Swiss-Prot record:
Residues 1-27 form the signal peptide. InterPro entries: Cys-rich_flank_reg_C, Leu-rich_rpt, Leu-rich_rpt_typical-subtyp, LRR_dom_sf, TIR_dom, Toll-like_receptor, Toll_tir_struct_dom_sf. Participates in the innate immune response to Gram-positive bacteria and fungi. Specifically recognizes diacylated and, to a lesser extent, triacylated lipopeptides. In response to diacylated lipopeptides, forms the activation cluster TLR2:TLR6:CD14:CD36, this cluster triggers signaling from the cell surface and subsequently is targeted to the Golgi in a lipid-raft dependent pathway. Acts via MYD88 and TRAF6, leading to NF-kappa-B activation, cytokine secretion and the inflammatory response. It comes from the Eukaryota. Changing residue 680 to H: Dominant negative mutant, blocks response to Gram-positive pathogens. This is Toll-like receptor 6. It is a single-pass type I membrane protein. One of its GO terms (molecular function) is diacyl lipopeptide binding. The gene is Tlr6. It is found in: Cell membrane; Cytoplasmic vesicle, Phagosome membrane; Membrane raft; Golgi apparatus. Residues 606-795 are cytoplasmic. The chain crosses the membrane at residues 585-605. Disruption phenotype: Animals with a double knockout of APOE and TLR6, fed a Western diet for 12 weeks, have less aortic plaque formation than single APOE knockout mice. They also show lower serum concentrations of IL1A, ILB and IL18.
């Protein structure tokens, strides 16, 4: 039986004991060693190795049959002890003699038949319910428990003065277990209940209600009844039982849970509470049996403000829906909540209704609900969460005549906005609209209440916000989390937006001008998006750094790079890219400036080190080597005595003798000089012609003095005619000193033409360049050339 009782009082224990438990545990919540849990361990006795400083001990759901003083006497700091769901038959409160700080004691759901009491001044919570007591186990010592706030008891029968010892206490909660209660001979018993805020009565779960006890309580705020089974015959017995309990003016809240009854009896119960002072009637786990017919109901003036029915099972499948729904629709109360039921519809009140709050969560309502209804003028809040709504525009049309509606919740339906026909009819009074967890797309923004302040669209199918959206100038909070948006929406159409939730979307490159567009934003939640850490993201991260830290929710932990792979998982706060790699203009200017600097530097170095001269000389050397390898065979077979004939002015003889001859002759190059090799007795012209013919090449040392010499011109003339032919390159010009073309006499047209057509070697004034000059000059001679000695020629 204890297993059946467990769920019955779960919620009551939670409500009544939560404050006490939290208050008791908070001072030592951080001391893990002071909380010991041995529940559900199949223990038959209390463990011996408990820590001496234990403050909270749970031994529930075991097989302990006895509690002795040595078991807990050493736990001097014990404040909470749970022994529920064991096999204890007897309890002597003297075992707690050394536990003077004990505040919470739960020995419910045992087999207790008797107890022995002693003073326990600190006790606040005492639960003796769901045991095997014959009469209420209330000792006179209980009257000294001045701190007691919760008292749980059970008995098979009552006596009027059983609770007299605790009548003067100010209790918050009293739990009476009446599961084992039975009447004898149809007699009616009486019981005076002490003053308490909450009275919870638990009846047998499988028996028809049969309690005949006149209970009276002077000050009661909340009455809770559990396990009520009724039919049409004993329905009146429950109302008789409740008559005395509900008489007091302080009773404002009545809760019935786990109730099985007929529809006729249900209507009678509603009618019973209608004239009573009860303001809040709550019914949980209602099962309707037998038939459902239209029942008469008198909607007189009532103190009832709210009727809440949650979790209804209807065992009647064929019935008049009008008979069922009209009873609720015509109630003249402010708040009606019917949730988790098989109801498929709710009719429109036939006359102007008093409803300001309607909650129809988790039913089977369709798009036809309240269509064309014009009697809900006072309705301020409508909740249709978890139903079968599909057409978004019909939902809008449903609200058209609800002129006071401020809050509408149609989340967790199957709403879609595909069939947009530009007919958008919302109640203009709507301020809060919850459209989350539906199948809406971006077109929903074309049809929204114009004055909405809070809009929840999270978990839909929105990929983008259209440009032609409804201008929602009053919108302050927008939740579009868990959609497929790729960018942060600007505030062009939402000028008053202050809160934006857009996490868990597909935002990879948030707009850098978001914060400029949304000047009033005070809370942004945009984490858990696949941010691409590229140049486009730099400005957004920079803008985040400019706003207050509390504005960006979840920063920086929820803002991480998703791409590229090398940066995946990196916090945006730690992501950095150089300005140069992200600014195209700056990059272009930098590259251009660098190239310009390099060009200027290169030009300067070229000029400073005379690089063009080196290049020119290298090209000449290369060409000379190439031509030397392709000398015609007939050139090599000529009878030659000299490698070179040198023509120069007497003014340049010092350079020829000191520079030219030593550098050529050291490599066995035979040179012909007129003053050294001309044959005396012959004319100068004959010697010139003769030795030019005997030389492989002719070298002319050009200078301003050269062009002033007639003989030098003759030598040049004869060399040009004798050594030059098509394809040959045996004339070498060395420019010792610069010669301007204008300074060459016109009669020396040969020289002028040669200098214009032929490449010549310039004598470098810098000594560092002279090595390349000599290498270039020597490369012009074929070292394997077979020369004939002068003596051999004579013979």
């Amino acid at each position: 039986m204890s297993q059946d009782r467990k769920p019955i009082v779960g919620s009551f224990h939670f409500v009544c004991a939560l404050a006490l438990i939290v208050g008791s545990m908070t001072p030592f919540s951080n001391e893990l060693e002071s909380m010991v849990d041995y529940s559900n361990r199949n223990l038959t006795h209390v463990p011996k190795d408990l820590p001496p400083r234990t403050k909270a001990l749970s031994l529930s759901q075991n097989s302990i049959s006895e509690l002795r003083m040595p078991d807990i006497s050493f736990l001097s700091e014990l404040r909470v002890l749970r022994l529920s769901h064991n096999r204890i038959r007897s309890l002597d409160f003297h075992v707690f003699l050394f536990n003077q700080d004990l505040e919470y004691l739960d020995v419910s759901h045992n087999r207790l038949q008797n107890i022995s009491c002693c003073p326990m001044a600190s006790l606040r919570h005492l639960d003796l319910s769901f045991n095997d007591f014959d009469v209420l186990p209330v000792c006179k010592e209980f009257g000294n428990l001045t701190k007691l706030t919760f008292l749980g008891l059970s008995a098979a029968k009552f006596r009027q003065l059983d609770l007299l010892p605790v009548a003067h206490l100010h209790l918050s909660c009293i739990l009476l277990d009446l599961v084992s209660y039975h009447i004898k001979g149809g007699e009616t018993e009486s019981l005076q209940i002490p003053n308490t805020t909450v009275l919870h009565l638990v009846f047998h779960p499988n028996s028809l209600f049969s309690v005949q006890v006149n209970m009276s309580v002077n000050a009661l705020g909340h009455l809770q009844l559990s396990n009520i089974k009724l039919n049409d015959e004993n329905c009146q017995r429950l109302m008789t039982f409740l008559s005395e309990l509900t008489r007091g003016p302080t009773l404002l809240n009545v809760t019935l849970q786990h109730i099985e009854t007929t529809w006729k009896c249900s209507v009678k119960l509603f009618q019973f509470f209608w004239p009573r002072p009860v303001e809040y009637l709550n019914i949980y786990n209602l099962t309707i049996t037998e038939r459902i017919d239209r029942e008469e109901f008198t909607y007189s003036e009532t103190a009832l403000k709210s009727l809440m029915i949650e979790h209804v099972k209807n065992q009647v499948f064929l019935f008049s829906k009008e008979a069922l729904y009209s009873v609720f629709a015509e109630m003249n109360i402010k708040m009606l909540s019917i949730s988790d039921t098989p109801f498929i519809h709710m009719v429109c009140p036939p006359s102007p209704s008093s409803f300001t709050f309607l909650n129809f969560t988790q039913n089977v309502f369709t798009d036809s609900v309240f269509q064309g209804c014009s009697t809900l003028k006072r309705l301020q809040t409508l909740i249709l969460q978890r139903n079968g709504l599909k057409n978004f525009f019909k939902v809008a049309l449903m609200t058209k005549n609800m002129s006071s509606l401020e809050t509408l919740d149609v989340s967790l339906n199957s709403l879609n906005s595909h069939a947009y026909d530009r007919t958008c009819a919302w109640a203009e009074s709507i301020l809060v609209l919850n459209l989350s967890s539906n199948m809406l797309t971006g077109s929903v923004f074309r049809c929204l209440p114009p004055k909405v302040k809070v809009l929840d669209l999270h978990n839909n199918r929105i990929m983008s916000i259209p440009k032609d959206v409804t201008h929602l100038q009053a919108l302050q909070e927008l939740n579009v989390a868990s959609n497929s948006l790729t960018d942060l929406p600007g505030c062009g159409a939402f000028s008053s937006l202050s809160v934006l939730v857009i996490d868990h979307n597909s935002v990879s490159h948030p707009s850098e001008d978001f914060f400029q567009s949304c000047q009033n934003i005070r809370s942004l939640t945009a984490g858990n998006n696949p941010f691409q850490c590229t140049c486009e993201l730099r400005d957004f991260v920079k803008n985040i750094g400019w706003v207050a830290r509390e504005v960006v929710e979840g920063w920086p932990d929820s803002y991480r790079c998703d791409y590229p792979e090398s940066s995946k998982g990196t916090a945006l706060r730690d992501f950095h890219m150089s300005p140069l790699s992200c600014d195209t203009v700056l990059l272009t200017v930098t590259i251009g400036a660098t190239m310009l600097v390099l060009a200027v530097t290169g030009a300067f170095l070229c000029l400073y080190f005379d690089l063009p001269w080196y290049v020119r000389m290298l090209c000449q050397w290369t060409q000379t080597r190439h031509r030397a390898r392709h000398i015609p065979l007939e050139e090599l077979q000529r009878n030659l005595q000299f490698h070179a004939f040198v023509s120069y002015s007497e003014h340049d003889s010092a350079w020829v003798k000191n520079e030219l001859l030593p550098n050529l002759e050291k490599d066995d190059i035979r040179v012909c000089l007129h003053e050294r090799n001309f044959v005396p007795g012959k004319s100068i012209v004959e010697n010139i012609i003769n030795f030019i013919e005997k030389s492989y090449k002719a070298i002319f040392v050009l200078s301003p003095h050269f062009i002033q010499s007639e003989w030098c011109h003759y030598e040049l003339y004869f060399a040009h005619h004798n050594l030059f032919h098509e394809g040959s390159d045996n004339l070498i010009l060395i420019l010792l000193e610069p010669i301007l073309q204008n300074n060459i006499p016109s009669r020396y047209h040969k020289l002028r033409a040669l200098m214009a057509q032929r490449t010549y070697l310039e004598w470098p004034t810098e000594k560092g360049k002279r090595g390349l000059f000599w290498a270039n000059l020597r490369a012009s001679f074929i070292m394997k050339l077979a020369l004939v000695n002068e003596d051999d020629v004579k013979t």
